[in-house]
Structure formats: C-alpha cells, structure tokens
Regions:
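Conserved active-site-adjacent core of cysteine acyl-enzyme catalytic domains
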Residues: 1-136
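Mixed-charge, low-complexity intrinsically disordered regions
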Residues: 1-2, 70, 137-159
Length: 159
C-alpha cells in the first residue's frame, strides 16, 4: 500500500529486496552457482570511504540501491571513481540534468548511464539520486564469487 492507502502502488517492497537477496544465496548453494548477496539497511547504506557499498564495487560486485528520482526506485551501481558512482538507471532520459554534477552517459549501455557524486547520493533529502533518510535506506550487494577481487586473490608476493 502507498501513502494514500492504494494497494499495489508502492513499488518494490523492502521485503521483496530481502527475499531476492536470500533467494540468490540459496539458489547459488543449491545449483552450485557462484553468486553471493547481502541485504543492507540504514547506516550500512552509504557511499564513501570504508562503506560496504564502495567495498563491494571495488571488489567487482554490483549494488542494487533504492534512490529518489521523482519517486523511490532502484538503480544498479556498477562502478566508482574517487568521488563519483557509476550507475545504471532503467528510467530513460534524453535531457541533461539541472544539477550539472549528475552526468548523463550515452556511450556505455552495458555498464552505466549515469555518473553521480557521492555527496548527492549520501543526501538524506529527496533530491535526484539521494539515498534519503538513513532509516529508510536499503541496498543489495551482489557478487560473482569466482570473479570477486578479494585480498587473497589480488596480493602479489615478492621474494
């Protein structure tokens, strides 16, 4: 139910996101597929140094995050640089954003179509691509366990 009490008009529920994370983990175990997922909420859903979201992206994972864009919906975070997140937003858009810092990308259709600064994503308000109030934040981290860049797989030994 949405804020007006209308059934089926509140988008994807938090319970659905928890379910998909659990389902991916169980499916991976049963079918021997190297997928791993973790459901995050609240303070764990932030973009910045030492955050689980950034750590996942640095290790080659992807993150499904709930953001504001006129209404709450989900985007796929696929990469980062020092101060920005690369993400795929399923909402099609041709016009540039009023916020010049939010970049519309048209030449990376299989990777991302937006670049958004960390500070815009970490905003607790309802601006475009804001993660919103900490108490309502949620995200799902997804990894291919065979391609995940863990310290054990990336450390080089010198003699």
């Amino acid at each position: 139910y949405n804020e007006k009490g209308e059934f089926g008009k509140n988008g994807t529920s938090r319970m659905a996101m928890m379910f998909i994370s659990d389902w991916l983990n169980q499916f991976g175990r049963v079918k021997k597929i190297p997928v791993w997922s973790e459901y995050l909420t609240g303070d764990d859903v932030t973009v910045g140094e030492h955050s689980k979201v950034i750590s996942a992206l640095q290790q080659g994972g992807a993150v499904v995050a709930r953001v504001m864009y006129g209404c709450w919906h989900y985007v796929l975070l696929t990469g980062i640089d020092e101060k920005r997140v690369c993400l795929f937003d399923p909402y099609y858009r041709k016009k540039a954003f009023k916020q010049a810092e939010i970049k519309l990308i048209t030449n990376m259709p299989y990777s991302y179509n937006r670049i958004v600064p960390y500070d815009i994503m970490n905003d607790t308000g309802k601006g475009p691509y804001s993660l919103g109030p900490k108490e309502t934040r949620e995200a799902v981290i997804i990894f291919n366990k065979e391609t995940q860049k863990t310290p054990a797989k990336t450390i080089e030994y010198f003699i």
